[in-house]
Amino acid sequence: MAEKATSLFLRAMEISEKQSFDVMRRNSSCTIRHLSSCGILETRRVSLPPPPSASSQMVPSRSFINLTAPLIMRRMEYSESRSINYSPEQMYDVVANVEQYQQFVPWCKKSKVTRGRNGDMRAQLEIGFPPIVERYTSEVTVIPNHQVRAVCTDGSLFNHLETLWRFTPGAAGQSCNVEFFVTFEFKSLLHSQLATMFFDEVVKQMVNAFETRAKKLYGTGVHRQQASLRRAI
């Protein structure tokens, strides 16, 4: 019985191998190119692949900037607080003087107040870090010596941009607590990806620029403490 089973098994293997050989021989006749007797490649029948179905369409590739990032716009936020040896009035004057931004704010090429001078105002700003140069309009509202708020109302760069500065008296003499908050969302996916890469460095340089401006105008102040929070939503 065992010998018969073995014989049947071997026979089945032979048949299987023969069928496989026949399939391979038939497939070889469909080869795109064959070597002719003269040794020259000669083109034969070519079967074109079927057109791709809807389910197999190629998915557009993501930006080369960040291949793992989702193809969506992201609103980004940053907040920071500092206690420094300048009065609330001094820091307020630095931040509220929007027309002077072009002199000390990084990447600010032009800054011009187009409406209002003391108190609430409208300003046009031009920012640029090559190859990007953009203009936008900002509505600035203030609470003298306490708060400066700016909101982008027109421009091709941002879907949303808002900055907020608050100044409160510090624990000692000529000092104050400065709170800074910014939230923004670019219209362009490319700009959004660039912001994700350089976000921390750009915002920190912006905040440092205002403290450096105060130092230039009022003398050396002491930077006492710093806390920052960043998140993208």
From Swiss-Prot:
Cell compartment(s), UniProt: Mitochondrion inner membrane
Domain of life: Eukaryota
Pfam family, one: Polyketide_cyc
Keyword vocabulary terms for this entry: Membrane, Mitochondrion, Mitochondrion inner membrane, Transit peptide
Membrane topology label: Peripheral membrane protein
Record-linked SUPFAM superfamilies: Bet v1-like
Record's GO cellular component terms: mitochondrial inner membrane; mitochondrion
GO molecular function: ubiquinone binding
Transit peptide: 1-34
One example of a Gene Ontology biological process annotation: cellular respiration
Disulfide cross-links: none
Gene3D superfamilies xref list: 3.30.530.20
Quaternary state and interactors: Interacts with coenzyme Q.
Primary role: Required for the function of coenzyme Q in the respiratory chain. May serve as a chaperone or may be involved in the transport of Q6 from its site of synthesis to the catalytic sites of the respiratory complexes.
Family label: Belongs to the COQ10 family.
PANTHER family linked: COENZYME Q-BINDING PROTEIN COQ10 HOMOLOG, MITOCHONDRIAL, SPERM PROTEIN HOMOLOG
Protein name per the record: Coenzyme Q-binding protein COQ10 homolog, mitochondrial
